[in-house]
Amino acid sequence: MTFDTMKKLITIAASLLWGAALFAQQALVPGSGIVSPEINADNTVTFRYYNPKAVTVQISGDFLPSQKITYVMDGQERVWEAPGKADLVERNGLWTFTTEPLKGELYSYTLYVDGQKTMDPSNIYQNRDIATWTNIFTMSTEKGDKGWYYEVQDVPHGNVSKVWYDSPTLGTQRRMTVYTPAGYEKNTKKKYPVLYLLHGSGGDEDAWSDLGRAVQILDNLIAEGKAEPMIVVMPNGVYFNQAAPGVAVNMFQPTITNSRSQSTEEVEMSFPDIIRYMESNYRVRKDQYGRAVAGLSMGGRQSAALSRRHPSMFGYVGMFSGVVPPEEDDKALEAVFAAKPKLYWIACGKTDGVMVNSLLLKEYCESKGYPVSFYESEGGHIWRNWREYLTIFAQKIFK
């Protein structure tokens, strides 16, 4: 056998091996060749799932008419808007469903195959909400709509760090997410204001950056000049958990129903540990009007409680679907407004079970002549609202 013949045989063998490896690799990727979801020109969205053995396939998503579920929490009846469901139609083993035209937004969904929850194998984009995983997609119908702010745009980008810090108050190390705006590394003489952004019950330090799209929102608002360049600190507000599942020292199942996580006292007492760490390790402003605190649901209550315990700590307070109801003669709330916050902002959805307490706080503040701002949106206790509230709140602070 000549050298040239041997060289050709080796080349052919290598090509065959490469092709086989590529085929095997593609076979390991579920849903290869199927596009799902597909955003159509008319702003409808088509979902596809191939399974010739399935009897029924349904989709559950927050783009469908919601199911209203009533439950009792803290002795109050509340309404949860659960995602609606729809049936996929099968043809030759391929199941499909197309939505009505949708508005710009971030949407979540899951599939149910013969009653069993299944992730869409053709969609690699997923989010975890407490202990529940869903597929997600974003869509924007025009620049400046909600979906546009939630997507990565061609603008200067900030950086995101997962930071461990010592909490002497709680006697442990804890983890938080820190966003620094574009230019932070270059503007070495500038000190930045800080927004402390708190998650809800069952959440963790990843919630606002993942589900809340806080990073994309801040990048895009700052690039447009609609928000001041700021650092955003997203701590873990469940005091007995070090960090999110998978990065803490213990294995645990996050849950929204754990009553221990609803306590605000431990967070109030240990929060100065976070501020001291930020002021020692980042270039931040150290005055009242260089700090803001805001949060959703439990994080809203924690924000309200923090402003009561430390009235002069924050110049801006935001409560998204979560407040501390006022007492008859609320001296702690009186101290908050005596410290002259520039913004005391309450936001809630019309069908949110927390609306009752939100209105009570609003009306109490108004009866005392306290300068309170109130924002009412459609919908209930859902991430769609909390992303919107952050987008609005971020444009109001540090100005």
Q: Predicted segments — roles?
A:
Residues 1-27:
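Bacterial Sec-dependent N-terminal signal peptides
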Residues 18, 30-32, 92, 236:
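Feature targets compositionally biased, intrinsically disordered low-complexity regions
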Residues 25-46:
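N-terminal edge beta-strand
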Residues 39-399:
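Non-catalytic cap/lid and distal C-terminal segments of serine-dependent acyl enzymes
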